[in-house]
Amino acid sequence: MFAIENPNTGKSEDQFERIDDSQRDDILDRSTVAYDAWRSTRIEERAAVLSRAADLYEERIDELADHIGREMGKLTRWAKAEVQIVADIYRYYSEHAHELLADEYLPAQNADKTVVRKEPIGPLLGIMPWNFPYYQVARFAAPNLLLGNTIVLKHASICPLSSQACQDILEEAGLPKNAYINIYASGSQMDAFVADKRIKGVSLTGSEAAGSAVAKTAGENYKKSVLELGGNDPFLVIDDENLEWVLDQYNLIRMYNTGQACNAPKRLIVLEDFYDRTVEYLEKKIGDMKVGTYDDENADIGPLSSIGARDEIVERLEKAAANGDAKIRVGGKKIDREGAYMEPALLTDVDPSTDVGCNEIFGPVAIVYKAKDVEEAIEIANNSEYGLSSSVWGTDLDAAFEVANQLNDGMTFVNEASVTAAGLPFGGVNRSGYGRELARWGVGEFVNEHLYRVSGQDNPGNSPAM
């Protein structure tokens, strides 16, 4: 059984039945049959479904936000923002459908016509996490449904309400039954799904361990995978012209979603000239933050996704401090109340070779590093096995862009956060995974770019091509 373990209260709520292995064949057969029909629909019909889905997300924003507030503790204002982004994604792919799926005509080269057409490849498996329950699904589902692929979606076990809502909205929007199938399944059941010949590709957002397992099985079965596995993103400040404003931006972005965002800036890197001012300012800023329930309008952050997640982070911080791997300047303790609450924390003097220095902390923990100059700041930023996103902050845009060009990430921003938008590609390198989602790149992963070359029988291009 899956149950909502409400992180706001620590209490178990609704329960949902998990599938058993005997149901796998039926699920995949239904998805395959649906694919044969869905791929044959006109682009206009698919776009209309996505457009209606966007409308439904907006119409149900309050209900949908409440689901994820109860499931994983997301503050209501953040939850509503997530639902709106999802609506934007579905609407983007609806409005740009013809542009994104347009045939590409190539120079004829002794043929009468040479064209590359974007075609679907079949049923896809999505394995999605709990931190953005609607957004992660939309990022994968919208472009692939537009292409004509069908989807089997295994969501995080703590998000049963929101995962079912994703299917319900698409079906109400006009998507044929079984073109999107939500399943309540365990991670251990996924290997058989990935290996099954009826699944033609798999997208996972989650842990490195899960990503490695999926990539291995997908590779052994000659099918494509897309992985988004988190990050330890740097936030470089190269001058102190607007220091307090920049630090406010950092704190806002780092603590967004209670610090549970893959592309949040985990490592703040500042020059030694203004390091002490940075630490002093953030120590007070973070110490003054209010922790509350998901529906508390005055809360700065909410609970962690689960009591277990909270306990793991607190234990890591305590161990780091005890071993001399970091100094906890403020926070980092459990809050004595029912639910998965902790004090937001600020760490300094972090040894980058230790757990808290080199591994992602998925919670409300800010880390400040000191660099003697810009060159060392770049070196610290690139001293990571991750490579999701980064940002550079400075008043000299040319200098900031020069720094940005030296960072080894999938996405780099100057004077703004690692933003998510339907029209921007999303993805990383190294231990952060591979592949791209959103914008035109979203229809470029699970697609057959099919070459058609047409020649008359009297065309000299018919001779062997060797």
Sequence positions of predicted segments:
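Residue-level signal for inorganic ion chemistry
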Residues: 10, 46, 68, 90, ...
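Structural signal for hydrophobic packing residues in well-ordered secondary-structure cores
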Residues: 35, 39, 54-61, 65, ...
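ALDH superfamily catalytic-core signature
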Residues: 209-351, 414, 461-464
